[in-house]
From Swiss-Prot:
An individual GO BP term: SOS response
UniProt binding sites for Mg(2+) 2: 260, 262
GO molecular function, one term: metal ion binding
Residues that bind Mn(2+) 1: 248, 260
Cofactor annotation: Mg(2+); Mn(2+)
Signal peptide positions (record): none
Documented EC number(s): 6.3.2.-
Protein name, as recorded: Probable alpha-L-glutamate ligase
Family, per entry: Belongs to the RimK family.
Superkingdom assignment: Bacteria
Length: 301
């Protein structure tokens, strides 16, 4: 197969591994800088141009679209879909998963466990908003934040009010969530490929920190997940319509709670921790499922 990898940087671990895994299995792998692809939208025959030439003959496309280029990246991916190229994850599923609030609304509708979450616009509603999630300590999250940036733990009511007021004053969209103390600064990253959890790791925040992101100095270790956690991760990816997803789960006193569903999960942490050839499993999934013109919009909303 001829497989496109949409990535800003061919030297990134995840991009490199996907290219290696594809080439090892006899496929032609082409890395395309997402922001350098351009399109004639109204042309009768959909096309994408790159460095002065049309992109042709692709069987599948692997989107590795960073959060900051979601809008343009999804437009390029949509154009590939119009050309009948099979996407590892569909554009509509990626844009759905990048909207944190929309994601939680969809997961909630399907009865998937979530931390109690509040959202408001007016500063007048701050006391009610805090009460809604059970009071302090609580977590405040910027809706546009990634990799733990824009996530604040407020240990007192006063601190929570001040931080929420500050964010609202800057006209930033935030959500307020209950703090799951019993998780002890740890979460579980479940790597889902084609309705199976193919690998899982526990991420533990460094001492004095509550965010477990590896980018923030967290450490990763092997973990045995429960059948309920496995089912939760698979269902969450399915609701979002993602074939490949990193589902982040907290262990709480009332079962697994989904924190986030990531449509472009990094491979380095999960491969290094588990020793699994995740890139190879992704290429295998494409071999079994990539059919020309097969873009089914999975998930609803």
């Amino acid at each position: 197969m001829k497989i496109a990898v949409l990535s800003r940087n061919p030297r990134l671990y995840s991009t490199r591994r996907l290219v290696e895994a594809g080439e090892r299995r006899g496929h032609q792998m082409v890395v395309i800088d997402t922001l350098r692809a351009y399109m004639n939208i109204a042309s009768h025959k959909p096309q994408i141009h790159y460095r002065g030439r049309p992109l042709e003959g692709f069987d599948a496309v692997i989107p590795r679209i960073g959060a900051s280029v979601t809008f343009y990246g999804c437009a390029v991916l949509r154009q590939f879909e119009m050309m009948g190229v099979f996407p590892l994850n569909e554009s509509v599923a990626i844009s759905r998963s990048r909207d944190k609030l929309r994601s939680l609304q969809l997961l909630s509708r399907k009865g998937i466990g979530l931390p109690v979450t509040g959202f408001a616009h007016s500063p007048d509603d701050i006391p009610d908003l805090i009460a809604m999630v059970g009071g302090a300590p609580l977590v405040i999250k910027l809706l546009e934040g990634t990799q733990g940036i824009g996530v604040v733990l407020c240990e007192t009511q006063k601190a929570a009010e001040s931080v929420i007021e500050a964010f609202m004053g800057m006209e930033q969209n935030i959500m307020v969530q209950e703090y799951i103390q019993e998780a002890g600064g740890a979460d579980i990253r479940c790597f889902v490929v084609g309705e199976k959890v193919i690998a899982a790791m526990k991420r533990q925040a460094k001492p004095g920190e509550f965010r477990s992101n590896l980018h923030r100095g967290g450490t990763a270790s092997l973990i045995k997940i429960t059948p309920e956690e496995r089912m939760t991760a698979i269902r969450a990816a399915k609701v979002m319509g993602l074939n490949v997803a990193g589902v982040d789960i907290l262990r709480s006193n009332h079962g697994p709670l989904v924190m986030e569903v990531n449509s472009s999960p990094g491979l380095e942490g999960i491969e290094t921790t588990t020793g699994k050839d995740v890139a190879g499993i992704i290429i295998e999934y494409l071999e079994k499922n990539a059919e020309h013109g097969l873009t089914r919009t999975r998930g609803k909303g």
